[in-house]
Amino acid sequence: MRIVIFILGILLTSCFAGNEIESGSSKIKISMLVDGVLDDKSFNSSANRALLRLEEDFPENIEKVFSSAASGVYSSYVSDLDNLKMNGSDLIWLVGYMLTDASLSVSLENPKISYGIIDPVYSDDVQIPKNLIGVVFRIEQGAFLAGYIAAKKSVSGKIGFIGGVKGDIVDAFRYGYEAGAKYADKGIEIVSEYSNSFSDVNIGRAIANKMYAKGIDIIHFAAGLAGIGVIEAAKELGDGYYVIGADQDQSHLAPRNFITSVIKNVGDALYLVTSEYLKNNNTWEGGKIIQMGLRDGVVGLSNANKFEYIKVIERKIVNEEIIVPYNHEGYEIFIKQILKL
């Protein structure tokens, strides 16, 4: 369940003006730990590019940047974060919801280090430390647009969704997508499965081939490297088999098969928050979550201009005329109350 959220515009005017963490120092070291692999052609790649861009744009502020990757267990995350601390890091970014628990423990243990985390999943009763800022995305809003397009474009009337490991973030993709599809066409058939992996390309390909064999002609995925297998399956099958990507524009991997990608501009968000920190004498007031969505320009679709008809739907979401569900409970309410199904 989501905790109380602070809107981006309000936060950026206040969160850097309070308690100082190592304020006024000269050049600093910024580090990042991602869950999985750095070059995942998606989520982590976007964050890593942002870190390198910060180093280029703020040479007078940044001494050095570090990037590291880990996967699997809590102890591994904490060990890697400790290594980044020992490297002299002043600001450490954690990328991926699997690092949620680690973000709390390391920030509490190291109050003089500033921490940021992308896509944390905290329970309602968690008190976020003052040196920790979380960034979450209303990714269900972008997925809703993708589902709407998929339902309109499908020839067979059957579309699919493949998620990685089931959890709040992946479910937001799924239920936003399903809600958008049903909003466009109440009769659309939707099949959703989970690969239980963010790294197994072969399982992604196998699930996609099974779906395509059953007449599904469009698959949206949010599965990390397993999603590469979905792309490969569509590419091998050729025309008439389509995919919708996740996190960043992946259309170059299969131009003839891509409809669009649900964009989560992880890099832009990381860059924005970090640049504000640098511009404000390295002052970092945490204890808050920043929520970003369509309104902030960090969630949306690649090649959005290709789908002019979707702009009406986008405006309704931004104006809260459509409240997009991000979990199963919200989806059931959406279906019953909004669509009367």
Curated annotation (Swiss-Prot):
Lipid-binding residues (covalent, S-diacylglycerol cysteine): C15
Superkingdom of origin organism: Bacteria
Keyword Lipoprotein among record annotations: yes
Family matches, as Pfam families: Bmp
Keywords on record: Cell inner membrane, Cell membrane, Lipoprotein, Membrane, Palmitate, Signal, Transport
UniProt keyword annotation of Transcription regulation present: no
GO annotation, cellular component aspect: plasma membrane
Family classification: Belongs to the BMP lipoprotein family.
PANTHER family named among the record's database cross-references: ABC TRANSPORTER GUANOSINE-BINDING PROTEIN NUPN, TRANSCRIPTIONAL ACTIVATOR PROTEIN MED
Subunit structure: Monomer.
Annotated protein name in UniProt: Basic membrane protein B
Species, as recorded: Borrelia garinii subsp. bavariensis (strain ATCC BAA-2496 / DSM 23469 / PBi)
